Amino acid sequence: MGAAVLEVPLAGQGLRSAAGELVDWRVSCFREPAGEALLDAVERRVRGLIQRFEPTVVAIESPSGVRLQMSPALGGLVARIRSAARGAGLRFVAVSPAEVRKRVCGSETATRKEMAEKLAERFEGLGRYCEGVGEVRIPVGRREGKRESYKVSSWQKEYWGPMFAAVGVGYAIVAGFE
């Protein structure tokens, strides 16, 4: 699970930039098996982030219908995050992946790597994580007379991808306040 916290100045203070300042970004890993224990752990983590950062909005990237059909537990996860937000009296927003890409890159068809690069340009400190998103290719060897084959570094993609997705969602929400 990726999480990002963006800060937007109050009305009248003026925005230094279109998307405020990135206060925190992180990746949370859970060891609990799928089921109630995992849902409880995610909800506790979200409540902890809400207490620590006192946001005004909790936003997620909305899962597509296909992903919800393939993983019924995903619907439960979204419900738990929504419950944590509403329990704290906060607005809960789900943004489609296409809308996130459009607001970050100007195109609904941008790749994860393009989105990561745009966010790294905007937010200092994220550039070093770009290599872990999208098209990282590692040679896995070649046979005589054959082209070299590559594979995506799955641990980097799995680890940093959610963090960039979370920052992208935050950016998209803040950009919507303009």
Predicted regions and their residues:
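Phosphate- and other anionic-substrate recognition elements at nucleic-acid/protein interfaces
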Residues: 1-178
